Amino acid sequence: MGIYSFWIFDRHCNCIFDREWTLASNSASGTINSKQNEEDAKLLYGMIFSLRSITQKLSKGSVKNDIRSISTGKYRVHTYCTASGLWFVLLSDFKQQSYTQVLQYIYSHIYVKYVSNNLLSPYDFAENENEMRGQGTRKITNRNFISVLESFLAPMVNQ
């Protein structure tokens, strides 16, 4: 299996979209925006945030030191951070080298078209002060975004 899950975090640490695939043989299996994934989202964002903070402290001067992927024995986490503070995260098997360009494409061609340019979609997913720091409950539910994202990622799920 190539891709296990896909996550989008906003600038307030909230998981605003998550998709998890459970069966390699069926790219339609799994969950979208599931309540069960909330704890996993917090752990994943916490790990990325902590490693990013460490790399910024270790980098000298004005040299930009971004995290693009994190590897473990069985998994690889691919990340892409936008200028507006959105984090696009893809969890894949260890064999996949880089999904940075895939994440950039998802942001620039799918997210911008179906979420950012949609006047009915919220600009900021944290409605008030209480929904910051990972406490937000609003998710991306745009059917067009979900279907285009599904069709784009489906071939990579079964790699």
From Swiss-Prot:
Give any Gene Ontology cellular component. Answer: endoplasmic reticulum
What is a biological process (GO) this protein takes part in?
A: endoplasmic reticulum to Golgi vesicle-mediated transport
Alphabetized UniProt keyword annotations: Autophagy, Endoplasmic reticulum, ER-Golgi transport, Golgi apparatus, Transport
The highest taxon in the source lineage is: Eukaryota
Q: Is Transport a UniProt keyword of this protein?
A: yes
State where it is primarily located: Golgi
What task does this protein carry out? Component of the TRAPP I, TRAPP II and TRAPP III complexes which act as guanine nucleotide exchange factors (GEF) for YPT1. TRAPP I plays a key role in the late stages of endoplasmic reticulum to Golgi traffic. TRAPP II plays a role in intra-Golgi transport. TRAPP III plays a role in autophagosome formation. Required for sporulation. Has a role late in meiosis following DNA replication.
Family note: Belongs to the TRAPP small subunits family. BET5 subfamily.
Under PANTHER family, the record lists:
TRAFFICKING PROTEIN PARTICLE COMPLEX SUBUNIT, TRAFFICKING PROTEIN PARTICLE COMPLEX SUBUNIT 1
Subunit: Part of the multisubunit TRAPP (transport protein particle) I complex composed of BET3, BET5, TRS20, TRS23, TRS31 and TRS33. Part of the multisubunit TRAPP (transport protein particle) II complex composed of BET3, BET5, TRS20, TRS23, TRS31, TRS33, TRS65, TRS85, TRS120 and TRS130. Part of the multisubunit TRAPP (transport protein particle) III complex composed of BET3, BET5, TRS20, TRS23, TRS31, TRS33 and TRS85.
Q: What name is this protein filed under? A: Trafficking protein particle complex subunit BET5
Q: What organism is listed for this UniProt entry?
A: Saccharomyces cerevisiae (strain ATCC 204508 / S288c)
The taxonomic lineage of its organism, from the top, reads: Eukaryota, Fungi, Dikarya, Ascomycota, Saccharomycotina
